[in-house]
């Protein structure tokens, strides 16, 4: 009996949909989830964020860093 091929479920963007949170540079708790423990922005292939929302997220993180709401690097 042949085994069925493994089906990887497609990830859904956490920022698209009705109840999705808005990307805001002042919401540091939300932005913190998309930053690694070293302070780098986590890529979208890991977080499943769409390309458009990843650009918005990166801009919000960079703005929050500039305003000293988030650190540039963690030691």
Swiss-Prot record:
InterPro entries: Ribosomal_bS18, Ribosomal_bS18_CS, Ribosomal_bS18_sf. The keyword Hydrolase does not apply. Part of the 30S ribosomal subunit. Forms a tight heterodimer with protein bS6. HAMAP family: Ribosomal_bS18. The keyword Phosphoprotein does not apply. One of its GO terms (molecular function) is small ribosomal subunit rRNA binding. GO terms for cellular component: cytosolic small ribosomal subunit. PANTHER family: 30S RIBOSOMAL PROTEIN S18 (PTHR13479), SMALL RIBOSOMAL SUBUNIT PROTEIN BS18M (PTHR13479:SF40). One of its GO terms (biological process) is translation. The lineage of its organism: Bacteria, Pseudomonadati, Pseudomonadota, Alphaproteobacteria, Rhodobacterales. Binds as a heterodimer with protein bS6 to the central domain of the 16S rRNA, where it helps stabilize the platform of the 30S subunit. This is Small ribosomal subunit protein bS18. Pfam families: Ribosomal_S18. Keywords: Ribonucleoprotein, Ribosomal protein, RNA-binding, rRNA-binding. Belongs to the bacterial ribosomal protein bS18 family. It comes from the Bacteria.
